[in-house]
Amino acid sequence: MYAVVKSGGKQYRVRQGDELLVERLAGEVGDRVELPVSLRAEEGVLDLEPRTARAEILEHLRGEKLKVYKYKPKKGYRRKKGHRQALTRIRVVEV
């Protein structure tokens, strides 16, 4: 059985026991969170009823650094900026 859950404006296909990285979730390590399920499938039968999946927060971390660089030619205008996305690693406990 698998389900499609929503988190941080994205959708993820998960099974029970899966670990995944999602955008930062509120809560402490060890807390359980509920994620809305948009689709659930079991043995080829689709279930579209609104449900929730439960997941456990394993750790909070930051993604790899992205460098953004912009410039205007012939004018000496240069800007460099970095960004690291805040992420949370979760384990799906129940679908």
Curated annotation (Swiss-Prot):
The keyword rRNA-binding applies. It comes from the Bacteria. One of its GO terms (cellular component) is ribosome. Keywords: Ribonucleoprotein, Ribosomal protein, RNA-binding, rRNA-binding. The keyword Transmembrane helix does not apply. PROSITE patterns: RIBOSOMAL_L21. HAMAP family: Ribosomal_bL21. This is Large ribosomal subunit protein bL21.
